[in-house]
Amino acid sequence: MTVLMLIWMSYGPISIALSVVIFCILAVSLKFKSIFYRIVQFDILMNTVFYVNCITYKLKTIEEYHRVLLLIFESYPSLFILREGLSFWAYRFQCSSLLLKCIFRFTYAKYPFAAEIWKKHYRLIMVSTIFYSILLTIPFVFITKEHHGFDYYAFTMNIETVIYLLLTIYLGRLTKLSLKKRSKRFAESIKKLNNYIYCDLFIHGVAFFGVMIPKMLSFEWTEETKDYILTFTVDAINLASTYIIIICDSNLRKILFCHTKKLTTSVFQVSAVPVSKLIVSPQ
């Protein structure tokens, strides 16, 4: 097993399981009825799909699995097209989703009835976001990734990221102006949403300034090094929504850790039962 796979195994399966648990808690618990949590659920669901799709890229670093993958893709070309399509679509969707959350925060801050409108048209908004992000993905399919040592794909992604960054800053400014007209109590209630978006922006900022720009400018890096860096960057973005909501939401943390504590306690209680009581008497 390669070093890449060993590192991934240390956090990958746990993160997938945690994403499923968080998604279920948000769906079932009555404490999370707000439309904001439906958007977070949508994020977690799509990012988990993208994350699972990325596993096939990691498996190709192991020769045995690489041969199996090639055989599968040769037998079912549609699976290969689906994998490549999801990999192209992932970043477009994540940027669109980030912009969607900023729009939600702005409308929620400016219009008192915004939450009801979002709740009423939630499915339409989500479908529109998916459709919009797919349209944005189409041009990137035809962009040559690298030519004469210059990474055109990374360059185009950087331009795309700058555009989204400027849009989020602009919407943030409008939101701040709108909050001045609302009560302090309302401004306090929106703090959780602010923290979530700030963390999301931070992750995208690190990916942009710390990874994508150096990746594009560092011609002396080997392709293997670039692939490793890109793989873990993609993982960070795909897993961000799960860990961010845990960090930002105290109610979710209480439920999550309470369930964990109860599970641990019950395990110890079973172990502490006297042996005599575990023996079934003959009939």
Curated annotation (Swiss-Prot):
The chain crosses the membrane at residues 3-23, 35-55, 68-88, 124-144, 152-172, 201-221, 228-248. It comes from the Eukaryota. InterPro entries: 7TM_GPCR_serpentine_rcpt_Srg, NRL-Serpentine_Class_Gamma. The keyword Membrane applies. It comes from Caenorhabditis elegans. GO terms for cellular component: membrane. The keyword rRNA-binding does not apply. One of its GO terms (molecular function) is transmembrane signaling receptor activity. It holds the Pfam family Srg. This is Serpentine receptor class gamma-46. Its main location: membrane.
